[in-house]
C-alpha cells in the first residue's frame, strides 16, 4: 500500500494543521542570513513554510501525491516533510500518529465509498483562521457502505 502512504503524506503536507513548531532557544550567538541571533533568543520554527517550499515540492499549493513518489512509483522520503517538527523536539507521538492515520484511512476506504455533498470544484481548503494552528473550512461527506 505504498500509494496510500504517499496520499497520507501529501494530505499532511498540504493541510498543515499546526504550521508552527515548538520553540527552540538559541544556545550560542548565531549568524543567520546576515542577522545576528543572540544567545537566549527564542525561535519558533515555521513548519508550514518548509512544507510549501517550491524547492522541495514541485506544486507546493496543490494536492500532488507524486511529491512522495520516485521514478519507479515507490515511496520517496523528502527532508522537507516535517509535519511533526524535527530535531530534539520532534513530536514524541509521531510513530503512533502515523500508524493510526494509516489504519484509520485504510479501514475507512476499505469499508466505505466517500461521496462529497458539495461539488469538488467548490471545495476550498484555505484556512479560515491561521496562527499557531490552521482552522480549515468544514465540509459534509457521505460514507456509503461497500
Curated annotation (Swiss-Prot):
GO molecular function: heme binding; iron ion binding; monooxygenase activity; oxidoreductase activity, acting on paired donors, with incorporation or reduction of molecular oxygen
The entry's keywords: Heme, Iron, Metal-binding
Cofactor needs: heme
Protein origin, superkingdom: Eukaryota
Protein's UniProt keywords contain Transmembrane helix: no
Chain residues that bind heme: 91
Keyword Metal-binding applies: yes
Pfam families attached to this UniProt entry: p450
InterPro entries: Cyt_P450, Cyt_P450_CS, Cyt_P450_E_grp-I, Cyt_P450_sf, Cytochrome_P450_fam2
Similarity comment: Belongs to the cytochrome P450 family.
PANTHER family named among the record's database cross-references: CYTOCHROME P450, CYTOCHROME P450 508A4-RELATED
Official protein name in the record: Putative inactive cytochrome P450 2G1
Organism: Homo sapiens
Gene designation: CYP2G1P
